[in-house]
Amino acid sequence: MAQDVLTDLNKVRNIGIMAHIDAGKTTTTERILYYTGITHKIGEVHDGAATMDWMAQEQERGITITSAATTCFWNKNQINIIDTPGHVDFTVEVERSLRVLDGAVAVFDGKEGVEPQSETVWRQADKYDVPRICFVNKMDKLGADFYFTVDTIVNRLGAKPLVIQLPIGAEGGFEGVIDLVEMRALTWRGDSKGDVELGAKYDIEEIPADLKDKADEYRAKLLETVAETDDALLEKYFGGEELTVAEIKAAIRKLTVNSEIYPVLCGSAFKNRGVQPMLDAVIDYLPSPLDVPPMEGHDVRDEEKIIIRKPDSTEPFSALAFKVAVHPFFGRLTYVRVYSGHIASGSQVINSTKGKKERIGKIFQMHSNKENPVDSVTAGHIYAVIGLKDTTTGDTLCDPQDQIVLESMTFPEPVIEVAIEPKTKADQEKLGVAIQKLAEEDPTFRTEQNQETGQTVIKGMGELHLDILVDRMKREFNVEANVGKPQVAYRETIRGTVDKHDFTHKKQTGGSGQFAKIQIKIEPMEVTAEKTYEFDNKVTGGRVPREYIPSVDAGIQDALQVGILAGYPMVGVKATLLDGAAHDVDSSEMAFKIAGSMAFKEAARKAKPVLLEPLMAVEVRTPEEYMGDVIGDLNSRRGQIQAMEDASGVKVITANVPLSEMFGYVGDLRSKTSGRAVYSMSFGSYAEVPKAVADEIVQKNKGE
């Protein structure tokens, strides 16, 4: 169903659907696509037929891994939806989706309330200032409790929900919602599966008598919040005058766009109830590209010089690439969010992040993995583009005559790795291609060659992440390979400072020799997502010629790759070049690079080197009778219990546990709790490994 791209940006919404892994996010998106007329048969996740889940593994596992971008239309408005994965191993997908969205629908499970992953995703959305509406889903589920879920939004997220709907009935008796803005009831009475319209029709009725008091109570709270936005409304409200529906909606919109409140709706996507009012709320309350602040970037030559781009087709062209995917027919697809200007297919643009020219090939607006070709891209929209060769996630594309670099995204370092060995020479070549393609798509996927064993090591964000990457290598690229056991990505750092360390590199073997003399200081520094190492030059009087100083830095960075304790990369080090000397004939960049590397290795040995390991934030939900066993087990894994809370019928235990102790945890937890407990885990931070454990790791690495 090809409809034209809307040029009136007031009628455009770029939104994401975000949630915990099982809150029903993909089902909700499927229903949106059904009601907006794009799919004719609803894809059920448990049939493996969901339209948005388009990679083979997604359909098998029933989880969404890649954020498919879809365009649909609702009441003459255009909604561009990005479906984001809720599994913690795929935080990078969520992060890059949020970066290019204007608003989001946070889907919560009506029984579980705010779950750990909902919290992680919510915090990521806070980071990018994304306005949200909340959809309490699965109201038909046994144990569903709308009011409990709203409480968890307050208590666990510290957010300010504004209830604009109440459920009519719950569990098997859930049949509709009360609209508190228009004070009416919407009911879906058809058989949830047999109804030909699949919930497309609903009745508008009077509010049921038994819910009238509750509706009045929540309506009063709603009006109070709304009236406070504006003096004129406040006067009207306290003067006893009725506020009009238009006034209420405008006030809710203003508060939502400013992220002061989060409207809460409810329904059951699976039972086709409550989805259309949620779509209305997307249009009524979430921002259009014109409601969000203009995009800021900086000058290509001067990072301090800020440039503003408004979402207007007359401004110079600028766009951010937020995802690269390999399409079975078209090859490399780059998803872009266009922030300003417009540009036609076939035009030349510049990738200002890399300083490379690119040509825009075919352009599509995507429906999951089907494509609707368009002739040009225009401000405020999301597109998939073919033909970009050098552009990767986070790069800026812009007008060659009017360049800008938009703020990119930061991605976490991988915490887990696995060795992979191709079975034949042909597989070795295929593996090379697979690695290159997958790394283009996924910035948290890294690879390296182990110098000693010659093995290829792939690194990722968790066991599921690596499983899926290996699975894709086998399926999409036909790589036959043996895969090792997952290994923890340890790091090394220093705890002490070495104020002065001298090193002279001298080599004389006839002809011109090599000479470099340096004095360095090394000290610990705080590690951030952007910075794990710093180099400072304090040499005065030209004692080390300027052209050799970058070589010292490069030598130290080389040495950081292979730590001195057990060969793991070193982080959290600041190195300062204090002094040195050069020889007119024998000094060279190579000599100073070697000196930098050797001086650092020697100094690091004296600087109290220690081993670091990834600590995972683990949350376990268990029935109370197994709580003692679960806590005992976490303690035996060197876990530190952080908190214990009550949630609906279960105990929630949060702990920090070293990743190395969490392999195989899912099976152990199942057997200890008869399969009734569930857990989730996300990367927390790096922490020092206790000495006894560190000694064992060092010995093992040296013995290999």
UniProtKB/Swiss-Prot annotation:
One of its GO terms (molecular function) is translation elongation factor activity. GTP binds at residues 19-26, 83-87, 137-140. Residues 10-290 form the tr-type G domain. The keyword Cell membrane does not apply. Keywords: Cytoplasm, Elongation factor, GTP-binding, Nucleotide-binding, Protein biosynthesis. Gene3D superfamilies: 3.30.230.10, 3.30.70.240, Elongation Factor G (Translational Gtpase), domain 3 (3.30.70.870), P-loop containing nucleotide triphosphate hydrolases (3.40.50.300), Translation factors (2.40.30.10). InterPro entries: EFG_II (IPR041095), EFG_III (IPR009022), EFG_III/V (IPR035647), EFG_IV (IPR047872), EFG_V (IPR035649), EFG_V-like (IPR000640), EFTu-like_2 (IPR004161), G_TR_CS (IPR031157). PROSITE patterns: G_TR_1, G_TR_2. It is found in: Cytoplasm. One of its GO terms (biological process) is ribosome disassembly. The keyword Cytoplasm applies. It holds the Pfam family GTP_EFTU_D2. Its main location: cytoplasm. Catalyzes the GTP-dependent ribosomal translocation step during translation elongation. During this step, the ribosome changes from the pre-translocational (PRE) to the post-translocational (POST) state as the newly formed A-site-bound peptidyl-tRNA and P-site-bound deacylated tRNA move to the P and E sites, respectively. Catalyzes the coordinated movement of the two tRNA molecules, the mRNA and conformational changes in the ribosome. This is Elongation factor G. It comes from Clavibacter sepedonicus (Clavibacter michiganensis subsp. sepedonicus).
